[in-house]
Amino acid sequence: VVGLGNPGKEYERTRHNAGFWLVERFAVASGAHFRNDPKYQALVARLDPGGKAGNAAPAWLLMPQSFMNASGRAVQMLAGFFKLKPEEILVVHDELDFPPGVARLKQGGGIAGHNGLKDISQRLATHDYWRLRLGVGKPPPGTEGGDYVLQKPTADERAAIEAAIEKALALLPQMLAGDMQGAMNKLHTEDKPPAKKEPEKKEPPIKEPGKKEPEKKAAAVESAAAPKAPEKKGLFGGLLGKKK
């Protein structure tokens, strides 16, 4: 399980580090401990079989420390050393195409300009690894996507992202067990927004029997005189046929 983000205090609370947030919380929940491995240029934690994570085989948590656009090196080295296939790799990352509060699971597909995914795909020579996408929302007009993801989310956005992380964390043991399709079905069902309620139609008031409605007053009193013909105007608004 690879969490994507940028190392350093100045980045730890930015939208681009949503992948780090999930993997760090999963490590705590699983009782795993990260160690800095210079060989991978990453923080690495091992999940032993039969532990809290529920994995039947050994698994690893990875947080590359070489900045986002060079994330692929650590993934390539760990996958090569442990003979991991692309379909055995899950990359957790921020996603502009979904609003905060939404998490989606998919295998392969486009990378939508995400530099971390771009480097991983180039290093592995495939897009066929699994991806857990955490929605962070689209940038407002006039803001570049690259600048937006390096900013901190608002308090409400952060709360929504954390809620999506909670849902995904509950399904990670199922993912580690290999049931990606089952986990996907649950995740995509649970995070659908509730249907909008149609506004209630107001019923007209019930008339009391034998009660007449008050007559409506005329908006204007009609003049008995015939309507005057409009005055003719010439160029520049001057009146025609009118003596000074």
PLM-predicted stretches and their roles:
Residues 104-110, 149-153:
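Short glycine-enriched, charge-decorated loop/helix-capping segments at active-site entrances
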Residues 149-152, 171, 175:
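Helix-loop "lid/cap" segments that line or gate small-molecule binding pockets
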Residues 216-244:
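Long, low-complexity, intrinsically disordered segments
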